Amino acid sequence: MTGNEKRKKKRYARSVRKRQKKREKQVGEYDDIERVIHPDALFDAFHACEKGVAWKASTQKCHYNLLFEISGSYESLSLRKSIQKGFYCFNLMERGKLRDIASVHISERYVQRSLCDNALAPVCTRSILYSNCASIRGAGLKRSEEVLIRQLRRYYRKHGNNGYIVLFDAKSYFDSIPHENIIADIANLFYDPDIIRLYQEFMGAFDSIHPECQKGRGLGLGSQISQISGVMAANPVDHFLAEIFSLGYGNGRFMDDSSVIVKDKASAVLAIKVVDLLYQRYGLALNKKKTKAVPLNHPFIFLKRKVIVRDSGKIIMTVSYTHLRAHE
């Protein structure tokens, strides 16, 4: 090994140690299972969970015996015992689409809430792009609309409305997310094995609501664990489009719906091929019927909003007519 190669190796080792220390400093505050299962944390998590559902009999019963419930949960979690009580499965019509909901019992829900609020969310959202707006505190549909309008304005100042926006849709997004990939991502973010184990237990519980052939895949709607996992599942694809795909001029995501602005039709076709390959790599599937490239000087629909970019640069965003008909 030459002297130059030795210097490069030492420089790389110093860089790795520096990144490791920075990561430990950022994550260290949340990398502690006691922060998640402490009675005070569980107490706060319960009161956050009961908002909007305090009228339910199960919630009132848990509230009436709250100290006893929290004491039992803390003891079980400290001894690494399971606290799972299965799912309540039902259907719900949301934005004109019938969805299968798998809701957890309130006594398990507040533990999941504590895990998400005191560990997963503060750490995982560090790597989430600003344009990824679903299920993140302070984000939401309004910010997603603002991000899209800002990207369109920035593109218009350079190229006018002569371009394309590629609208992606993931096929059966929550039903196809591989558990192995998400668990590996969480294991890379945390050092505490108990946090990883608890998250793995919650993820493994979804196997009980899926057929045998789908074991190890899919999440259930109605769980906060599902929401943070859904946000993380396609995060590598978003980073690729934002940081490596040089033909893009801005991208956004709201769970299974995402977009990227490109300059011409060839770049749009390439973007679809690239995202299709990346989805396959991470165990997801692109809905090729709903995925399409639309010229920016044509109206398009994203997140149930109809968007028009005028030749003058004026951007008009309204609720789509098809969305209104679904609610009639």
Task: Give the positions of each predicted feature.
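Non-catalytic, polymerase-adjacent accessory regions of viral genome-replication enzymes
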Residues: M1-S71
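Active-site-proximal segment of RNA-dependent polymerases
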Residues: E29-D32, C116-F168, S172-D175
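Reverse-transcriptase-like RNA-dependent polymerase core
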Residues: S76-K97, R197-H210
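Conserved pre-motif C helix in the palm subdomain of viral-like polymerases
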Residues: L98-L129, K215-E243
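Conserved polymerase palm-domain catalytic core
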Residues: Q151-M255, S259-L278, V294
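Conserved catalytic core of two-metal-ion nucleotidyltransferases
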Residues: Y282-I308
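Conserved small/polar residues in nucleotide/adenosyl-binding loops
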Residues: T322-E328
